[in-house]
C-alpha cells in the first residue's frame, strides 16, 4: 500500500486572463530632448576636463612664487571692483546729501554764493540787442524759463513774444489782433512756472490770462481783481500764483485746481511790485505808501518795513532773509527780515537830472548770491556787490544801453542778464527818449567757475 506522501499530485495550472500580456523589460527610447541634453552635458564635461587639464598643465609649469603672484593679482582685482562699487555708492550718497543740505540752507536763507569777484566786465561783443516787429511800442516786462531754454517779453502794444535762447530767434507771438478776446491793451506783467508748464500774463484789464508756454494756446482766465494787475509771480517749484494789483490787494491762485484761494489786504496805495521764492510767502512794494510788506501766508500775518520818502516802486528778494528795494527818489536799499530799517542805503544810485534824482525803474537779483543789478533811464544797467554781512554795497561795473530799463532778469547760472528796453517808462508816458530803441538786450557775462560758498548763522 503506497503512502499518499509518495504520490505526485497533479500540477496546478495557472490560467491567465484573456488580455493579460507579459510585459517585456525593453528599455525606453531616449527622447530627442534628452539626447540633446546628453550631448550638451557630455560636451560641457569635455570642455571642463580640457580646461582643468590646461589649468593643471599651467600650474605644473608655474613655480610657487608665480602662483602666489597670480593669486595676489586676482585678489587685488576683486578688491578694486568692490571698492569701486562702494565709492560709486558713496559718491551718490554724498551728492544727494549735499543737495539736501543746500536746499535746506536755501530755504532758511542761510546760503550765499560769493560770486561777485568772479564776474568780468562784458565787452561790446558780449552784448546783443534783438527786436521784433510785433513790439511796436515800449517793452514792459520779461521772464525766463528755469531751464534757460526760452524767454518771453511783453510790450505796451499788447503783444507777447517768445524767444528761443539756443535758436537765437523769435519762436512765436501772441498779438492783440489775433487774441483780442484775451489781450486787452498793453502787457503789464508776465511770469512762468518753475516747471515751464504755465505762462501767465496781465494787461490793462483786471484779469489774468493763463497760457501754454510751449504751444501758446490759451488755457484759462482768472477773474477777481477790481483794477489792472501790476505784478505776477509763481512760488518756486509750485503752481501757486501770487498777483498784485492797483486795487491794493494781493490774491493767491492755485493753478493745480484752477481756482482762487484768498485775498490779502494791507497796502494803502496801489501795489507796484511783487516777488516770491520757495517759502509760502510773498513780498510787495506799496508805491506811495512807502512800505514793503512780507506776507506770511501760512501764519496769516505780515511784516511791514517803512522805506525812504517817495514812491517805493521795486522790490526783489536776494534770498529768503534779505531783499533789495528801489524808489523814485533814486535810492537803493538792502534789507533784512530781522530789522525794520535798511541795512544799507545808496542815494541817487543812477545820478540826477536837473537836480532831480533818476528813479529806479527795475531790479534783478542773482538768487542766493552777492550780486544784483539796477536800471533807470541814465543809459546804464548797473551791477552791484553786497558785502560785509549785507551792510555795504559796492559798484561793480555798468553796461551802456540807451533807453528805459523797464524790467530785467538773470538766468539761473548768472551768465546772462535779459533787459526789456523801451523809449518810455513802463507805467506811463511822462517823457520819451527818442534816441532809444524798443527791444531786448542780452548781456553775456564771463564768470570763473570756482566761487566761494558762505553759510550764515
What is each model feature region?
Residues 1-138, 428-434, 444, 452-457:
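Intrinsically disordered terminal extensions that flank WD40 beta-propeller domains
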Residues 130-158:
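Beta-strand-rich domains and repeat architectures in extracellular enzymes and scaffolds
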Amino acid at each position: 500500500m503506497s503512502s499518499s506522501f509518495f504520490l505526485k499530485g497533479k500540477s496546478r495550472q495557472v490560467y491567465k486572463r484573456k488580455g493579460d500580456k507579459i510585459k517585456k523589460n525593453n528599455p525606453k527610447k531616449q527622447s530627442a530632448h534628452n539626447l540633446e541634453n546628453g550631448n550638451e552635458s557630455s560636451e560641457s564635461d569635455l570642455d571642463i576636463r580640457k580646461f582643468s587639464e590646461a589649468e593643471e598643465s599651467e600650474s605644473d609649469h608655474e613655480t610657487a612664487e608665480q602662483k602666489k603672484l597670480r593669486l595676489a593679482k586676482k585678489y587685488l582685482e576683486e578688491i578694486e571692483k568692490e571698492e569701486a562699487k562702494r565709492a560709486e555708492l558713496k559718491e551718490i550718497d554724498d551728492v544727494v546729501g549735499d543737495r539736501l543740505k543746500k536746499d535746506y540752507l536755501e530755504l532758511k536763507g542761510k546760503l550765499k554764493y560769493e560770486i561777485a569777484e568772479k564776474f568780468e566786465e562784458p565787452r561790446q561783443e558780449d552784448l546783443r540787442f534783438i527786436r521784433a516787429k510785433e513790439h511796436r511800442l515800449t517793452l514792459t516786462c520779461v521772464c525766463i524759463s528755469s531751464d534757460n531754454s526760452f524767454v518771453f517779453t511783453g510790450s505796451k502794444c499788447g503783444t507777447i513774444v517768445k524767444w528761443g535762447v539756443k535758436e537765437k530767434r523769435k519762436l512765436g507771438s501772441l498779438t492783440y489782433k489775433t487774441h483780442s478776446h484775451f489781450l486787452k491793451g498793453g502787457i503789464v506783467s508776465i511770469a512762468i512756472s518753475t516747471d515751464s508748464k504755465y505762462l501767465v500774463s496781465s494787461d490793462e484789464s483786471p484779469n489774468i490770462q493763463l497760457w501754454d508756454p510751449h504751444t501758446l494756446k490759451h488755457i484759462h482766465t482768472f477773474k477777481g481783481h477790481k483794477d489792472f494787475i501790476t505784478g505776477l509771480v509763481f512760488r518756486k517749484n509750485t503752481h501757486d500764483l501770487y498777483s498784485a494789483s492797483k486795487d491794493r490787494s494781493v490774491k493767491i491762485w492755485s493753478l493745480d485746481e484752477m481756482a482762487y484761494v484768498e485775498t490779502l489786504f494791507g497796502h494803502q496805495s496801489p501795489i507796484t511790485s511783487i516777488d516770491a521764492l520757495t517759502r509760502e510767502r510773498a513780498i510787495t512794494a506799496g508805491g506811495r505808501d512807502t512800505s514793503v510788506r512780507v506776507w506770511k501766508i501760512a501764519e496769516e500775518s505780515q511784516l511791514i518795513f517803512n522805506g525812504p520818502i517817495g514812491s517805493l516802486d521795486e522790490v526783489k528778494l536776494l534770498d529768503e532773509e534779505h531783499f533789495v528795494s528801489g524808489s523814485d527818489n533814486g535810492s537803493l536799499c538792502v534789507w533784512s527780515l530781522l530789522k525794520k530799517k535798511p541795512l544799507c542805503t545808496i542815494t541817487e544810485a543812477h545820478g540826477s537830472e536837473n537836480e532831480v534824482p533818476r528813479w529806479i525803474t527795475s531790479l534783478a537779483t542773482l538768487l542766493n548770491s552777492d550780486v544784483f543789478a539796477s536800471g533807470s533811464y541814465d543809459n546804464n544797467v548797473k551791477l552791484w556787490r553786497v558785502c560785509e554781512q549785507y551792510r555795504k554795497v559796492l559798484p561793480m561795473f555798468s553796461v551802456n544801453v540807451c533807453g528805459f530799463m523797464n524790467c530785467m532778469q538773470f538766468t539761473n547760472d548768472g551768465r546772462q542778464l535779459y533787459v526789456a528796453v523801451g523809449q518810455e517808462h513802463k507805467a506811463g508816458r511822462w517823457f520819451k527818449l527818442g534816441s532809444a530803441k524798443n527791444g531786448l538786450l542780452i548781456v553775456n557775462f564771463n564768470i570763473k567757475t570756482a566761487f566761494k560758498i558762505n553759510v550764515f548763522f
